[in-house]
Amino acid sequence: MEQEYHIGIDLHKRFSQVAVLNKEGEVLDNRRVDNDPPLLLQHLSPFPKETPVTLEATIGYEWMSDLLAGNGFKINLANPKKVRLIAEATIKTDKVDAVTLAQLERTNFLPAAYLPPPEVRDTRELLRHRMKLVNLRKGLKNRIHAVLAKRGVLFYPVKDIFGKVGREFLSSLQLPSIYRKEVDGYLSLIDQIDFLIKKREKEIKSQVVKENKEAQLLLTIPGISYFSALLLVAEIGDIKRFPSPKKLASYTGLTGTISASADKTYQGSLKKDSNKYVRWILIEAADHAIKKDPGLFAFYRKIAHKKGENKARVAVAHKLLISIYFMLKNNQVYQLRKPSGKPLLCHGRQ
């Protein structure tokens, strides 16, 4: 009968601590191994395929996961935040190391984290990069606005000063040399980022399936663009992994809004250790959604009056997230609502 093993790996930048336990939990080996793929595979070569290997979902886990999964090991990903709490309660230690990870997996107490398939992870990376470039561009544009404000240029004759006509306006401004060079430098960077964004978008359109039914559903939400819809689908993954809207809200960090009744709404703080990409998209979309959805606009005004505009935007983002949960679960398009909360348009199912 083949011996049963449980392996835990505490991943560091240059090395990993690798612990091997037997079926009874006895530590057979616990040593430091350099993060060199051939060395790691050589060290693990005595163990049979499908041997469970547990890693924490920390920065840089992907290469290790791919390496070991590609060589027949069964990968388990642990939730870093929860693993310490469970370790304290079950095996009486607050030290999360390779042995701890292996013990938690062996005893079925491991708090698992979602392990996306490589193709989903690659799609996320592609879409996240585009989003980061868009944010960089937005930051540079804000810097130009700040420079112009320093020189008393507070009002513009055009709506978009970064379009063709707007660029002509910027070129015509009589700015001192130091400010002119600053504006021109930022514009040059914006042009470079524009090029990279277009290049990324071309790659996304060629690599990500255009007929993504889930993304098409999310496009019916006011304020959600094509690329935002794709990123939401990639970040959320299979909606079935969330048993309730509350679990999805916890995953995205939009748990601060709790409707106690029709008349009371509590606004708490956002969870920082959560999916910031989904959270960012929905908070950005909230501004557009309240302009299109009468029900959301009424809700926004009510919260803004009591708690302020920023918390109202987060509350709207939370409502959008709950809608997304049921849209994906039930294959439904988005429904606009009357100020009373009742459906304004009923699209039914697709």
Where are the regions that the model predicts?
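Gly/Thr-rich phosphate-binding beta-strand-loop-beta motif of the actin/hexokinase/Hsp70
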Residues: 2-22, 101, 133
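Short glycine-rich, Thr/Ser-proximal phosphate-binding strand/loop in the N-terminal lobe
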Residues: 17-38
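Short, basic/hydrophobic alpha-helical segments
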Residues: 35-52
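Acidic beta-strand-to-loop metal/phosphate-binding motif
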Residues: 50-58, 101
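Short alpha-helix plus adjacent loop in nuclease-associated cores
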Residues: 76-128, 264-274
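Glycine-rich, often acidic, oxyanion-interacting loops/wings at catalytic, nucleic-acid
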Residues: 131-217
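Phosphate-backbone recognition surface of nucleic-acid-processing proteins
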Residues: 217-220, 226, 230-310, 344-346
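Low-complexity, acidic/Ser/Thr- and charged residue-rich accessory regions of DNA metabolism proteins
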Residues: 263, 299-350
